[in-house]
Amino acid sequence: MTDKIRTLQGRVISDKMDKSITVAIERKVKHPIYGKIIKRTTKLHVHDENNECKAGDLVEIRECRPLSKTKSWTLVAVVEKA
């Protein structure tokens, strides 16, 4: 059983927690009736072991086992500093 590990890129919107960040994932979807492409945003709590991220950074994250009630993603790399 080879499951592909989910990785996403997003923008850090909060780094006020210890060893945790909040990342906004933006995706574009087509409206079911009107057909217009619209933006949808999902907020995820991400584990940041070394507190290396600041608000505004572009980061790559991957899914992992649940670390707390709301955290099941971990930081892979900082793609671009703010």
Swiss-Prot record:
Q: Would the keyword RNA-binding be found if you checked this record's keyword annotation?
A: yes
Q: Please, which domain of life does this record's source organism belong to?
A: Bacteria
Q: In the UniProt record, does the keyword Ribonucleoprotein occur?
A: yes
Q: Which UniProt keywords apply?
A: Ribonucleoprotein, Ribosomal protein, RNA-binding, rRNA-binding
A GO molecular function for this record? Answer: structural constituent of ribosome
| CC annotations in GO | cytosolic small ribosomal subunit
Gene Ontology process terms (BP): translation
PROSITE patterns per record: RIBOSOMAL_S17
Q: Name one Pfam family in it.
A: Ribosomal_S17
* InterPro entries documented for this protein: NA-bd_OB-fold, Ribosomal_uS17, Ribosomal_uS17_bact/chlr, Ribosomal_uS17_CS
Q: In UniProt terms, what function does this protein have?
A: One of the primary rRNA binding proteins, it binds specifically to the 5'-end of 16S ribosomal RNA.
By sequence similarity, the record places it as follows: Belongs to the universal ribosomal protein uS17 family.
Fetch the NCBIfam families from UniProt: PRK05610.1 (NF004123), uS17_bact (TIGR03635)
Q: How does it assemble?
A: Part of the 30S ribosomal subunit.
Q: What is this protein identified as?
A: Small ribosomal subunit protein uS17
Q: Provide the species name.
A: Aeromonas hydrophila subsp. hydrophila (strain ATCC 7966 / DSM 30187 / BCRC 13018 / CCUG 14551 / JCM 1027 / KCTC 2358 / NCIMB 9240 / NCTC 8049)
